[in-house]
Amino acid sequence: MPASQTGKVAIVTGGTANLGRLFAEALSADGANVMVHYNSARRADEAGETVKALEAAGVQAASYQGDLTDRAHITGLVDSTVERFGSWDILVNTTGVIVRKPLAETTEQEFDNSFSVNAKIPFFLMAEAFTKMADNGRVINMVTTQVAVTAATYSCYAGSKSPVEHFTKAFAKEIGPRGVTVNCIAPGPQKTSFLYGAETDDTLKWLAGQTISGELGEPADVVPVMRFLAAPETSWVTAQTVYVNGGMISPIN
């Protein structure tokens, strides 16, 4: 059974769609109050619907819109959360952007944006957590299976997610004395708009064939891992990357 998060406060970035929405729903179902972040004003309606769905679980919920590549919005998100709920215990960072191009064809703008979204955001969210997260908190960063083995045309995506593993390990040691754990989840390819927007049908079939089951993952497959890492009882699991990819790759094969 999922551990009770009653009275805890969670921030879920990218919390209106795909994994972010599922994570927010799972945390609220476990009793946590949730601040749902979303990037674009175009998602305001989705954010409102998400907040209503979370409140239906009997918890408090709110939303914050902002481009987190701007450090001021990171601070604003955290400060708004603490002001609204009184504390901050859990961070689940799902922000990400895919550039699927050969390295030599990737533009400087695409490179800069990839590193701003995939690496800068989690780095400075963790910086905020150092002084503003409650003791015994939980930090969970979403990376990708490709931090272990990178496929062709994914140099920018995998390269901009890889630093997050190192940030996570270092930050786990820096904040660990306060009982805060810091971990990564590295999903494989899943049936989401995030993947479908970057891949052809042939590539999707090939990716599915790399898993043991021959199927792409579902976002729901990752939720139990997030719940485990966010649980109050999971205090001795930190500085780790958990691969959730249907057996398609591990960091040692």
List PLM regions with ranges.
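A conserved structural motif in NAD(P)-dependent oxidoreductases
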Residues: T211-V222
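Conserved glycine-rich Rossmann-like NAD(P)H-binding loop of the short-chain dehydrogenase/reductase
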Residues: A32-A47
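Catalytic loop of short-chain dehydrogenase/reductase
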Residues: I140-P163, T168-P177, P189-Q190
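Short C-terminal tail/terminal secondary-structure segment
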Residues: V149, R227, T238-N253
